[in-house]
């Protein structure tokens, strides 16, 4: 008998399994993962789902780290390299390069993707964090610098927004047969797969779990802090530990339709309303590295749980308080007031970061205020820019 996950519609209060069949909750208790994801994985003989390896003892300390911006909203042909005492900035803005036709250039669009390369002793590891809005931009930018997907050791998805996972399926399709077997993709929990809408009610998509598993990817559920590729620390879910009031960006709905969406049995009862509700981004995660003699480098993609909360969770998950660099989107945009942004900048400044790299959704007001408050420490991310830290970056 052939079973297809597309037959299953699991919405709050429904039971598609029927009398005499394995109940949905029984299946979940037996496996610890979503039933549709399990069936898809088994039938395809491809990907799998597992709990991520928790951080045990001291976090890994890398000798060097470089972070390349693969997808972002901004590009600048005339950006120049910068060397500072603790951070080297490589800018690649022009299009006239040997072997690259003039038609090839960086593609900027709304979204974010970062590529982290770390060195620990004789070992180099490469982690891709988020995948931009479209595969066209992501793959174009990867091709522009000759980034080989076969070198990737782990994938991390910060949260379930299309401008962060939109390029993933295209990357997996274009890299078929090239990726390392069982390549892990870290997500912050079942909530990452929920269907989402914009505040105006527009469809904002949902992450294609069956498609990911069909590509042979190993889904790693990282609700708690976990180690990725032996070098990075994924934050786990981020508590709201400060007085921050981050913007509500989208709405979410539980339920499985055609294998897409999140399983209501793995969501709190308060979310199983059968309709779209305010998105709390419980699943959002950040990625951090501890760089030898420098401190913590925090990669926060959108900071929907609050940028200060994200930093605090990174510090808690690594046991390292010294903030060497903060990179990513901070979501300090309208309608947040200037006073709110100024207070957040002051709170970040109080943490004494050595460097801040503002990308994606950080906002112009944040950038202007932060540069005034912390001159020579705040820089703008551009597509293609690479930021390097440590002695062997």
How would you name each of these model-derived features?
Residues 1-22, 36-41:
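N-terminal secretory signal peptides
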Residues 10, 32-45, 50-123, 234-283, ...:
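Zn-dependent metallo-beta-lactamase
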Residues 81, 196-200, 338, 370:
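Short acidic, glycine/serine/threonine-rich loops at helix termini
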Residues 102-110, 118-154, 170, 177, ...:
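Pre-active-site segment of Zn-dependent metallo-hydrolases
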Residues 116, 130, 142, 159, ...:
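Divalent metal-coordination and catalytic microenvironments
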Residues 129, 228-237, 297-300:
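Short hydrophobic-aromatic micro-motifs
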Residues 153-224, 236-246, 346-354:
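Active-site HxH/HxHxD metal-binding segment of metal-dependent hydrolases
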Residues 154, 161-165, 268-387:
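Cap/insert and terminal regions of metallo-dependent hydrolase folds
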């Amino acid at each position: 008998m052939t079973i297809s996950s597309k037959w299953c519609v699991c919405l709050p209060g429904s039971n598609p399994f029927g009398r005499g069949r394995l109940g949905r909750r029984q299946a979940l208790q037996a496996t610890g993962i979503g039933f549709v994801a399990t069936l898809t994985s088994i039938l395809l003989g491809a990907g799998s789902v597992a709990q991520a390896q928790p951080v045990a003892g001291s976090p890994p300390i890398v000798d060097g780290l470089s972070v390349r911006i693969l997808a972002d909203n901004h590009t600048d042909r005339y950006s120049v390299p910068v060397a500072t005492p603790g951070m080297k900035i490589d800018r690649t803005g022009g299009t006239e390069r040997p072997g690259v036709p003039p038609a090839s250039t960086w593609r900027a669009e709304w979204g974010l993707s970062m590529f982290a390369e770390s060195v620990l002793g004789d070992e180099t590891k490469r982690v891709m964090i988020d995948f931009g809005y479209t595969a066209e931009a992501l793959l174009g930018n990867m091709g522009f610098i000759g980034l080989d997907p076969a070198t990737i050791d782990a994938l991390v998805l910060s949260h379930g927004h299309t401008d962060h996972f939109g390029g993933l399926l295209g990357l997996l399709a274009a890299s078929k047969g090239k990726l390392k077997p069982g390549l892990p993709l870290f997500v912050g929990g079942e909530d990452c797969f929920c269907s989402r809408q914009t505040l105006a009610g527009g469809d904002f998509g949902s992450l294609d779990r069956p498609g990911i598993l069909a590509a042979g990817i190993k889904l790693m559920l990282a609700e708690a802090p976990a180690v990725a590729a032996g070098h990075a620390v994924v934050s786990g879910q981020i508590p709201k530990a400060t007085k921050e009031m981050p913007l509500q960006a989208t709405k979410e709905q539980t339920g499985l339709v055609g294998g897409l969406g999140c399983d209501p049995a793995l969501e709190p009862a308060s979310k199983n309303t059968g309709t779209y509700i305010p998105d709390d981004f419980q699943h959002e995660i950040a990625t951090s590295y501890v760089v030898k003699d420098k401190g913590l480098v925090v990669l926060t993609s959108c900071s929907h749980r609050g940028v200060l909360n994200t930093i605090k969770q990174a510090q808690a998950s690594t046991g390292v308080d010294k903030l060497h660099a903060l990179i990513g989107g901070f979501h300090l945009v309208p309608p947040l007031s200037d006073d709110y942004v100024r207070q957040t900048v002051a709170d970040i400044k109080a943490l004494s970061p050595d460097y801040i790299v503002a990308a994606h959704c950080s906002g112009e007001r944040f950038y202007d205020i932060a540069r005034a408050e912390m001159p020579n420490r705040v820089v703008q991310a551009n597509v293609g820019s690479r930021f390097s830290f440590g002695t062997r970056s």
